[in-house]
Regions:
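Cleft-lining beta-strand/loop regions that shape enzyme active-site pockets
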Residues: 31-132
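Charged, glycine-interspersed solvent-exposed loop segments at helix/strand-loop junctions
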Residues: 137-213
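N-terminal secretory signal peptides that target proteins for export/translocation
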Residues: 1-10
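Sec/Tat signal peptide C-region and signal peptidase I cleavage site
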Residues: 22-28
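Sec-dependent N-terminal signal peptides
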Residues: 13-22
């Protein structure tokens, strides 16, 4: 834990030095532009603690305004997968590179895979785990949607949820394979439960198609 805190402080110091040397363009938190690089950092942000809806809109504005950006630097523990999916689409459309300086976990990996070229800093980590849905959030969704969806009992909802989960897994696998990830590695991304995290070594990331170099 102490080392993690030191690593985060060091990362923030590196970014700060970069700002002083190259100049910084202030944007909506957690985005920062330094020359031709766009930094997306939810780990050292003053406001954003995770990938969130609204970030995809800001990313679109930035990429349209700063057309010289060719690399997205990521440092995030994840967040809302829907927002990550939307940003991944923008990254693919912009045909830019992605680079992990510190940590990229969970939904952040979806964004990372959108990169044309995908690289990892020495000591950087890329983490995978199974998705999850909090019980209270499931209950809230059921109560708000049951009339529109025609769920007469929780069992009707459970049946829908079973099918929807399979569809989401299929969509995720199609995305992984479409971005050049090897089928066997795609299966292994589910090895860690929703409360765990799998950090493959660099060799595994290269052989699995996550890193391009």
């Amino acid at each position: 834990m102490v080392n993690d805190k030191l690593d985060k402080k060091m990362l923030k110091a590196i970014f700060t030095i970069g700002f002083l040397i190259f100049g910084q363009i202030s944007l909506a938190d957690p985005f920062i532009v330094i020359e031709n690089k766009l930094i997306y950092d939810t780990e050292n942000s003053e406001e954003a603690t995770e990938i969130a809806f609204g970030h995809e809109e800001e990313l679109l504005k930035i990429l349209r305004t700063h057309t010289d950006i060719d690399t997205l630097v990521l440092n995030s523990g994840g967040g809302m997968i829907g927002a990550a999916n939307d940003m991944a689409d923008l990254i693919i459309d912009a045909d830019i590179k992605t680079y992990v300086e510190g940590t990229c976990e969970s939904a952040c990996v979806t964004m990372f895979l959108g990169g044309r070229d995908r690289t990892l800093a020495l000591g950087g980590k890329i983490g995978f785990h199974a998705s999850w849905w909090a019980p209270d959030s499931i209950e809230e969704y059921y109560n708000s949607e049951k009339e529109d969806e025609g769920w007469e009992t929780p069992f009707d909802f459970a049946s829908w949820l079973y099918e929807d989960t399979q569809a989401e897994i299929l969509t995720e696998f199609e995305y992984l394979l479409g971005r050049g990830v090897k089928p066997q590695f795609a299966i292994q991304t589910l090895r860690a439960g929703s409360d765990g995290m799998w950090y493959p070594r660099r060799k595994e990331l290269l052989e699995g198609g996550i890193l391009t170099e």
